[in-house]
Amino acid sequence: MPGKPKHLGVPNGRMVLAVSDGELTSTAGSQAQGEGRGSSLSIHSLPSGPSSPFSTEEQPVASWAQSFERLLQDPRGLAYFTEFLKKEFSAENVTFWKACERFQQIPASDTKQLAQEAHNIYHEFLSSQALSPVNIDRQAWLSEEVLAQPRPDMFRAQQLQIFNLMKFDSYARFVKSPLYQECLLAEAEGRPLREPGSSHLGSPDTARKKPKLKPGKSLPLGVEELGQLPLAEGPCGRPLRKSFRREMTGGAMNSALRRESQGSLNSSASLDLGFLAFVSSKSESHRKSLGSGESESESRPGKYCCVYLPDGTASLALARPGLTIRDMLAGICEKRGLSLPDIKVYLVGNEQKALVLDQDCTVLADQEVRLENRITFQLELVGLERVVRISAKPTKRLQEALQPILAKHGLSLDQVVLHRPGEKQPMDLENPVSSVASQTLVLDTPPDAKMSEARSISPCRSQGCLPRTQTKDSHLPPSSSSLLVEDASSSTGNRQTCDIEGLVELLNRVQSSGAHDQRGLLRKEDLVLPEFLQLPSQRPGSREAPP
């Protein structure tokens, strides 16, 4: 019956996973109403919530999945959560949260200690030269001037953002991680939890020894092959099968996952839904692999790439095999409102050459990359009847962006006029490139100044020899090349008519001289028979024999 735990004949100390999905859902729903989203920041004011089917004293690990606030109240749970964040390279979030907790406990009258702790927190987590910077948005940035008048709640907004980031992002992955599943299984079997950071669960002294059997005897039904612990007992007193225990474990975990998915995800912090969906699918495949006894390769955590965005913030991207760098960054750029074609990707420390986005993203595992935004606009060259695409850094001015195209055509800034289509007023070349992003500009020249390519067209182009032009355009970016090809086809009427007769004569001449060898052309006039092959009458200096 919903609302009461199913005892199943399990002893009091082992009733960790014997709970139905409906109980977890109802408990989570009532708890969600009692706990405000991100409203309780201090660990001393975290709500206790309604009664839980898990006793926090006897089953503390199972209670960690109830809520993020309950996890923070347990020192052991907070230590395991910190260890999990270290593996994800984001331990600075929980470290910053704990530092803010200690800072709020300082009395407001103790201005000296407040100033010292505020200085330490700011320069370690919030300044532009911080050793462990946290990921907060621009609205929560603080200047160093606020340290002159410290208050116990001066970091409340920043702590709230990090709290929401951990609650709706990191905590969701923690309850699905193999680390939490190990702790949950150890508690279900009665084994002591290992210390966070060690490699084995339980100590060798406290672990039970394998039962010794007499000759001819076998282990009873339900006891694991390694003989560490007997399994939970069923209603008839017989131990439950290992597969049934796994089903109970999976059921409790699925209940916790469903409860987490029912919560609100409208957080002010960054939350990559596509990334969470992938983590959920990885957790599901890991659970299935445990149930079927397959390899443990699915449970291995993937490697991440640290991505520094143009606005100064950072994000973690999972480097999955089989995905390109373009696919890995597509979700981050879409979430931040960035156009991926206008982004250049550089390795931190090697910013001379941009990375190719079509290679496998596993090359960036455990690496740091920096994204630089590029401003693109189209420039219509009136003298050439051509449209080119220009990409430049946002910090550049218009005259700096136009310098390469002007140098290519042999022009200077004094000989051109830049304006928008339909306007005659020239634009100020000192304006930044960001002011003309995604626009089309017109580059006009006075009548006395002509572009070099418009004045001196190569004979090959005037005769319509397209292979050389295509070879030149093939080195340009695809967008530029396509634009150039379109302009070339649109200006066909300005070209000179090809000499068809001369072209036919040239083709005939090429066909007639098609047979070559190393000695030259093989023509009939050039064929000379060797002397030993000639007839006696054809040999030079030969006389006819008398009749």
Curated annotation (Swiss-Prot):
Q: What happens when the gene is disrupted?
A: No visible phenotype. Mice show an enhancement of postsynaptic long-term potentiation (LTP) responses in the CA2 neurons of the hippocampus that is correlated with an increase of spatial learning and object recognition memory (OMR).
Q: What is known of its domains?
A: The RGS domain is necessary for GTPase-activating protein (GAP) activity for G subunits and localization to the nucleus and centrosomes. The GoLoco domain is necessary for GDP-dissociation inhibitor (GDI) activity, translocation out of the nucleus and interaction with G(i) alpha subunits GNAI1, GNAI2 and GNAI3.
Name the consequence of residue 409 to L. Does not reduce interaction with RAP2A. Strongly reduces interaction with RAP2A
One Gene Ontology term, aspect cellular component: dendrite
Q: What does this protein do?
A: Regulates G protein-coupled receptor signaling cascades. Inhibits signal transduction by increasing the GTPase activity of G protein alpha subunits, thereby driving them into their inactive GDP-bound form. Besides, modulates signal transduction via G protein alpha subunits by functioning as a GDP-dissociation inhibitor (GDI). Has GDI activity on G(i) alpha subunits GNAI1 and GNAI3, but not on GNAI2 and G(o)-alpha subunit GNAO1. Has GAP activity on GNAI0, GNAI2 and GNAI3. May act as a scaffold integrating G protein and Ras/Raf MAPkinase signaling pathways.
Q: What is this protein called?
A: Regulator of G-protein signaling 14
Q: Which InterPro entries match?
A: GoLoco_motif (IPR003109), RBD1_RGS14 (IPR046992), RBD2_RGS14 (IPR046993), RBD_dom (IPR003116), RGS (IPR016137), RGS10/12/14-like (IPR046995), RGS14_RGS (IPR037881), RGS_sf (IPR036305)
GoLoco domain location, by residue?
500-522
Annotated effect of mutating residue 518 to A: Inhibits GDI activity. Does not inhibit interaction with GNAI1 in the centrosomes, does not affect subcellular location and does not promote gene transcription activation. Inhibits interaction with GNAI1 in the centrosomes
Tell me the impact of changing residue 261 to A. Answer: Does not affect subcellular location
Keyword presence, Metal-binding: no
Region described as Disordered: 19-59, 191-220, 447-496
- Positions bearing Phosphoserine: 20, 42, 45, 143, 199, 203, 218, 289
Lineage at the top is: Eukaryota, Metazoa, Chordata, Craniata, Vertebrata
- Gene3D superfamilies assigned: 1.10.196.10, Phosphatidylinositol 3-kinase Catalytic Subunit, Chain A, domain 1, Regulator of G-protein Signalling 4, domain 2
The subcellular location is: Nucleus; Nucleus, PML body; Cytoplasm; Membrane
Q: Which domain of life is it from?
A: Eukaryota
Enumerate the spans annotated as RBD domain: 303-374, 376-446
